[in-house]
Amino acid sequence: GLPKLPDNQYKMPDDLLAVCTVLHEEAGEGTVRVVFEPDFNLIVRQYDASFELVLDRDMVLTYQGSNTVSTDALTEQEIEDETKILQIITQMDLSLDQKEFYRSLREMNAEYIVLSSSSAAVSYVETAGCIPVREVEGHIIFRVEEK
């Protein structure tokens, strides 16, 4: 069966808990590699360590303007791919070629993307070839197909 999820002692947002539950239902057992929006990305592993974050925590913080962290642990290719993914999911620049975006997802071995339903990136991600799997608590979970 699925692992029993820990009690919500971290006071995680209910919508994040619901998303985590659905991701486990979809993915089955084992670790799941997920692209989360920055706010979820920074907290999800405190609640559930079976998620592998596609976006490195320090990369997200650097992207958001922090200069107290370092991305030295990442390769140039990882930084490039993660930057492309971030610029889409944060709706900063939706002009990136969708094939490029998809290639970066595949490079980073992303299995799922979770976006806020109201995000301007939703239609971009869908057009790029990600499959919307479920909508839950104001978020859409997309599966990244192996092409």
For each feature predicted by the language model, list its residue ranges:
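Extracytoplasmic
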Residues: 1-147
